[in-house]
Regions:
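Conserved lysine of the Walker
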Residues: 14
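Hydrophobic anchor at the beta1->P-loop junction of P-loop NTPases
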Residues: 4-6
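P-loop (Walker A) phosphate-binding loop of NTP-binding proteins
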Residues: 9
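ATP-dependent NMP and nucleoside kinases share a basic, alpha-helical "lid"
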Residues: 81-160
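Hydrophobic positions on the alpha1 helix immediately C-terminal to the Walker A/P-loop
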Residues: 17
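Small-molecule kinase domains that catalyze NTP-dependent phosphoryl transfer to phosphate-bearing small molecules
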Residues: 110-116, 124-129, 133, 158-208
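Glycine-rich phosphate-binding loops of nucleotide-dependent enzymes
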Residues: 137-146, 151-154, 194, 201, ...
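N-terminal phosphate/diphosphate-binding loop that engages ATP/GTP or pyrophosphate donors
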Residues: 23-87
């Protein structure tokens, strides 16, 4: 089993990069952030307060989260892959991920899903918490304005009307929450390779991460 951990803040491009790197290496791809977004979505729809740890943990435990072969996320039989990709659900994910019980439950599930498979797993605490012994650790980052522009472009591509100033404000608040939470905060693992991607194209970032993986674990 080889784990390639791709961590970084919102808008750093880790989802797209990790998915393409996994395809290039022939590895499985797993988006851990989607799981927290799904729990946030289900809690919001159920009217559960996002800081009510006991209720959110119970909801997460019964959610039946699973990925299909195309990487789409289901809660039971419902495909929630598109519904979770909003600024609101990003903020909800940040709040529920700070709850120790929720994080503990989902980290356990992420390790179970990985099994003994070669996998590219992306999130905010893969290299520091989920798989601290990962063979490859990469931390992607970029300037806040660049990350906000990327996130706004993603939302517009879905047909959403967005104000880039509001996207930037939400991004900075997400950074604050994720980096200051008591449990598994967002930070670069000491042995991770950091890539500042502000001036890089997507193809360049994918090639760089795939190259790092190949050098560290072989072709």
């Amino acid at each position: 089993m080889t784990v390639v951990a791709v961590d970084g803040p919102v808008g750093s491009g880790k989802s797209t990069v990790a998915r393409r790197v996994a395809a290039r290496l022939g590895y499985v791809y797993l988006d851990t952030g989607a799981m927290y977004r799904a729990v946030g979505l289900l809690a919001t729809e159920a009217g559960v307060a996002l800081d009510d740890e006991e209720s959110v943990v119970a909801l997460a435990r019964s959610a039946g989260l699973r990925f299909d072969g195309d990487g789409r996320l289901f809660a039971g039989e419902r495909d929630v892959s598109d519904a979770i990709r909003t600024l609101e659900m990003g903020a909800a994910a940040s709040r529920v991920s700070a709850l120790p019980g929720v994080r503990g439950l989902l980290v356990e599930e992420q390790r179970r899903l990985a099994g003994d498979t070669d996998i590219v797993m992306e999130g905010r605490d893969i290299g520091t918490n989920v798989f601290p012994g990962a063979a490859v650790k990469v931390y992607l980052t970029a300037r806040p304005d660049v990350r906000a522009a990327r996130r706004a472009a993603e939302l517009r591509a879905k047909g959403d009307e967005v104000d880039e100033t509001q996207v930037l404000a939400a991004l900075l608040e997400r950074d604050r929450r994720d980096s200051t939470r008591a449990v598994a905060p967002l930070r670069r693992a000491a042995d991770a390779v950091e890539l500042e991607t502000s001036g890089m194209t997507l193809d360049e970032v994918v090639e760089a991460v795939a190259g790092i993986a190949r050098r560290q674990v072989g072709p």
